[in-house]
Amino acid sequence: MNIELIVQLTSLILISIAGPIIIALLFVKQGNL
Protein backbone atom coordinates (compact mmCIF):
# COMPACT_ATOMS: atom_id res chain seq x y z
CA MET A 1 0.00 0.00 0.00
CA ASN A 2 1.13 3.54 -0.71
CA ILE A 3 2.06 5.42 2.45
CA GLU A 4 1.47 8.83 0.84
CA LEU A 5 -2.06 7.82 -0.16
CA ILE A 6 -2.82 6.67 3.39
CA VAL A 7 -1.47 9.94 4.81
CA GLN A 8 -3.59 11.99 2.41
CA LEU A 9 -6.73 9.99 3.22
CA THR A 10 -6.21 10.25 6.97
CA SER A 11 -5.52 13.99 6.74
CA LEU A 12 -8.68 14.52 4.67
CA ILE A 13 -10.73 12.53 7.19
CA LEU A 14 -9.25 14.47 10.11
CA ILE A 15 -9.95 17.81 8.38
CA SER A 16 -13.53 16.80 7.54
CA ILE A 17 -14.10 15.83 11.19
CA ALA A 18 -12.19 18.66 12.89
CA GLY A 19 -13.42 21.42 10.55
CA PRO A 20 -17.04 21.64 11.79
CA ILE A 21 -15.86 21.22 15.41
CA ILE A 22 -13.46 24.17 15.09
CA ILE A 23 -16.16 26.31 13.45
CA ALA A 24 -18.62 25.41 16.23
CA LEU A 25 -16.02 26.33 18.88
CA LEU A 26 -15.44 29.69 17.18
CA PHE A 27 -19.19 30.39 17.15
CA VAL A 28 -19.46 29.47 20.85
CA LYS A 29 -16.54 31.77 21.72
CA GLN A 30 -18.19 34.64 19.83
CA GLY A 31 -21.53 33.90 21.52
CA ASN A 32 -23.44 33.63 18.24
CA LEU A 33 -24.68 30.08 18.80
UniProtKB/Swiss-Prot annotation:
The keyword Transmembrane applies. It comes from the Eukaryota. Pfam families: PSII_Ycf12. The chain crosses the membrane at residues 5-25. The keyword Ribonucleoprotein does not apply. Keywords: Chloroplast, Membrane, Photosynthesis, Photosystem II, Plastid, Thylakoid, Transmembrane, Transmembrane helix. It is found in: Plastid, Chloroplast thylakoid membrane. GO terms for cellular component: chloroplast thylakoid membrane; photosystem II. It is a single-pass membrane protein. One of its GO terms (biological process) is photosynthesis. InterPro entries: PSII_Ycf12_core-subunit. A core subunit of photosystem II (PSII), probably helps stabilize the reaction center. Belongs to the Psb30/Ycf12 family. NCBIfam families: PRK13686.1. PSII is composed of 1 copy each of membrane proteins PsbA, PsbB, PsbC, PsbD, PsbE, PsbF, PsbH, PsbI, PsbJ, PsbK, PsbL, PsbM, PsbT, PsbY, PsbZ, Psb30/Ycf12, peripheral proteins of the oxygen-evolving complex and a large number of cofactors. It forms dimeric complexes. HAMAP family: PSII_Psb30_Ycf12. This is Photosystem II reaction center protein Psb30. It comes from Euglena myxocylindracea.
